[in-house]
Amino acid sequence: MGLTYQLIPVLVCLLVCTSHFAHGHKCDITLAEIIKTLNILTTRKNSCMELPVADVFAAPKNTTEKETFCRAGIELRRIYRSHTCLNKFLGGLDRNLNSLASKTCSVNEAKTSTSTLKDLLEGLKTIMKEKYSKC
C-alpha cells in the first residue's frame, strides 16, 4: 500500500508548515520562561540579591545582544556556583539565557564596573520584556 503521488506534496507541505510553527514559538516560550523566572527572582527578599557582579550592561556600544546575554550567564554561573542561595532559579535562568547567547564571550573583571545581582536581574527583565513584545 503506497502513497499516491498526489498525497506526497501535501505531506511535505504539512511537515514544513509544522516545523516553522514550532520554531517560531520557541522564542516566545523561552522568553516567557525567562521573564517568569526574573519576576520571581526580583520580588524575592534575599541577601544574595546584594552580591556584587560585573556590570554586563556597561559594555562597549558595539557589543551584541547575544554577547550581553553570554556575559550575564557568566555572572549568574559565578554566583550560583559559589553561593547556595537561589541556585534553582539562577541555574534555570542561566540555561535559558545560554540558548539566546553567543557561544563565547569574556567578562574582564579588572576593567568592568560592578553592580548588584538585583540590578543585573532587573536589567535583564527590562531587555527580555522588550524583546518579548517584538517576538
Swiss-Prot record:
InterPro entries: 4_helix_cytokine-like_core, IL-4, IL-4/IL-13, IL-4/IL-13_CS
Cysteine-cysteine disulfides: C27-C135, C48-C85, C70-C105
PROSITE patterns: INTERLEUKIN_4_13
Domain of life: Eukaryota
Name under which the protein is recorded: Interleukin-4
The protein's role, per its UniProt record: Participates in at least several B-cell activation processes as well as of other cell types. It is a costimulator of DNA-synthesis. It induces the expression of class II MHC molecules on resting B-cells. It enhances both secretion and cell surface expression of IgE and IgG1. It also regulates the expression of the low affinity Fc receptor for IgE (CD23) on both lymphocytes and monocytes. Positively regulates IL31RA expression in macrophages. Stimulates autophagy in dendritic cells by interfering with mTORC1 signaling and through the induction of RUFY4.
SMART domains: IL4_13 (SM00190)
UniProt GO BP: B cell activation; immune response; interleukin-4-mediated signaling pathway; negative regulation of inflammatory response; positive regulation of DNA-templated transcription; positive regulation of macroautophagy; regulation of immune response
Organism: Boselaphus tragocamelus (Nilgai)
Family: Belongs to the IL-4/IL-13 family.
Subcellular location per the Swiss-Prot or TrEMBL entry: Secreted
This protein's UniProt keywords: B-cell activation, Cytokine, Disulfide bond, Glycoprotein, Growth factor, Secreted, Signal
Keyword Signal: yes
Residues with glycosylation annotation: N62
GO CC list: extracellular space
Coiled coil: none
GO molecular function: cytokine activity; growth factor activity; interleukin-4 receptor binding
Signal sequence range: 1-24
